[in-house]
Amino acid sequence: MQSTTNNNTNKKNHARSNRSDNLSTVVSNRSAYRSASKSASRSNNLSTPGQSRVISYDDDITSDYNTYTINDYIDDPTTDQNTVNDDEGNIYGGNFFDGFIPTSNLFADNYEIKKLDDVIARTNNIMYGGRIPEDQIISTESNNIFGIKDFRVTNTEDTNDDNSNSQSVNSRTDSDNLSARNTSISNSLLTSGRNSASIRNANPLLVRNATSLGNSERNSPDRPSTQGDSSIRGEADNFSGRNASARNSASNKNSASRSSVSNKNSASRSSASRSSVSRNSESIKSSSRNSESRNLESNKNSTSRNLESNKNSASRNSASRNSTSIKSDSKNSDSRNSQTNKSKNQRGGLSEIKGIPVTDKFIGQNEIPTSSLGTHQYEPNYSLTSPGSIISTSSKLNNEAIRGINNRPIAGKNQVYPDTITDTNDLSSFFANTESNTIDQFGGQTSDKNNSTKSNTKYNKSSRKISEISYGTSKRSHNRSSNTSNLKSETDYDIFTANSEL
């Protein structure tokens, strides 16, 4: 035991005599430590190459085996025993940092810590890894500290911003959608046309928007661009507006109330020569029953219906902008059909199938769409042009009827369609398998599979006669009602069922 004590004393004296040359000499005697620090400060041996250092910059206390050169003793942090060698000792894992937790290369030597007299500056250097300019300490760990700090702050800020923006955007989106729906239903025809494009993919049988219809007609090389194109778009817009107003009716499940709301718009369009009767419902006998009989129902007699029919007929024939099913005696040069109209091939089409509004043309089997390239290029999708309108997918409509529907061309493809349709009897395939003796809800005739007509109690022959005159149809036009009279009540079928998101 005595020899061990003497040996330790000799080692300490040897350390004191060489402290100016070896900064790694650290003893437990604080006076000797302070002398070594002052000597290092004067000679700046810390940065001198070849000198033994307290800790090298590539060492880490978390590694399995780190050697820190020191004289005096060996410190094993796992035990309480110190082992002394003859020449020098090695410390395995751990170091003396004057009470500081040892970290890799941060304040690796006590001298760098002791030179910071200000406690606040010293604390800041420990916290920020030497970011204070006047007391910068070289440390590879400072970058890691910055990275962790920045990473956490960035994540927190990004998460908050994303959540905030997401909620705000969702709120604005809901508000905009609601506003767009209100605008479409209430006033703006343009907005209604734009919104119709958003429902193109909702159902393969949903209609295309009115804009594509207008563009396709405008691309026709065999007819100049006239006001008739705008008139076509107007039809679809007005038609959509009428449906929307009917949908917003306070009692939209009541057939009389729905008819009352929609007929107001119908009457105003008639006075402005954009009458809805110009769209020519095949299943309704006259314009009076199309625009006025829904209001009147059975409350008006046949005389008042005839008067309304005469009024609408005069308005349509005198200043019609969309002479849909009127003969070519319309005098307006901008009439859509005035350039290619024929008595047999007049523009017409079903405006209601089973209570569902329809405003597109129908091309029969003998009329093949053509294009400027001479090939039969047309879209295979079966769609109509009125926003919100659909074709009933009832099993009563056979496949032949579906194939008979001509799709409107997409704008910009230079596809040309003939400006005619076949006679209305070619549409009989739509109703080939329908039930017999179906009653027309508007007071029309009933029909069976043999097209034998029966007079309904609400039907008036004088009204039928006037309707034939006002329509100006061909010799077979009186058969329209018998082929298309099996309408379904609007109270039984909601025209917006398949498009509840509009």
From Swiss-Prot:
Gene Ontology cellular component terms for the protein in this record: virion component
Subcellular location: Virion
Keywords for the protein's UniProt record, in alphabetical order: Virion
Biased composition, class Low complexity, residue ranges: 1-10, 28-47, 155-171, 242-290, 309-327, 446-460
Region listing for Disordered, in residue ranges: 1-57, 155-181, 212-362, 438-487
Record carries keyword Magnesium: no
Biased composition (Polar residues): 212-230, 339-348, 470-487
Name under which the protein is recorded: Uncharacterized protein L452
Lineage: Viruses, Varidnaviria, Bamfordvirae, Nucleocytoviricota, Megaviricetes
